[in-house]
Amino acid sequence: MTKSELVEKLAARFPQLLLRDADISVKTILDAMSDALADGHRIEIRGFGSFGLNRRPPRVGRNPKSGERVLVPEKRVPHFKAGKELRERVDRNLTPSSGGSGNGHLTGTPSGKGPQGAAPGSPAVLHEGGGLNLARS
């Protein structure tokens, strides 16, 4: 699901909300979440999950062109952990007929191709029946 699809879904669910206002609402929420993470805070949405930061320590890497050793500095990377209710809902809806491979992975194959051959990095697609196809690498 893309941000614009989320905006459209929000506007459809609340007819009194103009599309412009739904867009502003989604942007405001995402900005607030991004700001909180950038400031080092954890975000918890009960029943959905939590967003936090993982620390990647500094390491020695290699420049792929020259083979030269390069010091890669420490990084903080966002991390999402699904809540119990979300995990149970996803597990309950993951059946072979809904596009899942039945092995617990949404990508379907080790090559990273999705159930319908979607390329890695493709956005999640939420279907009217509630099914979610997600291609990820």
From Swiss-Prot:
Keywords: DNA recombination, DNA-binding, Transcription, Transcription regulation, Translation regulation. The keyword Transcription regulation applies. It holds the Pfam family Bac_DNA_binding. GO terms for molecular function: DNA binding; structural constituent of chromatin. NCBIfam families: hip, PRK00199.1. GO terms for cellular component: chromosome; cytosol. It comes from the Bacteria. This protein is one of the two subunits of integration host factor, a specific DNA-binding protein that functions in genetic recombination as well as in transcriptional and translational control. This is Integration host factor subunit beta. Gene3D superfamilies: IHF-like DNA-binding proteins. Residues 75-137 are annotated as: Disordered. Belongs to the bacterial histone-like protein family. Disulfide bonds: none annotated. InterPro entries: Hist_DNA-bd, IHF-like_DNA-bd_dom_sf, IHF_beta. GO terms for biological process: DNA recombination; regulation of DNA-templated transcription; regulation of translation. Heterodimer of an alpha and a beta chain. Residues 128-137 have a biased composition (Gly residues). Residues 75-92 have a biased composition (Basic and acidic residues). SMART domains: BHL.
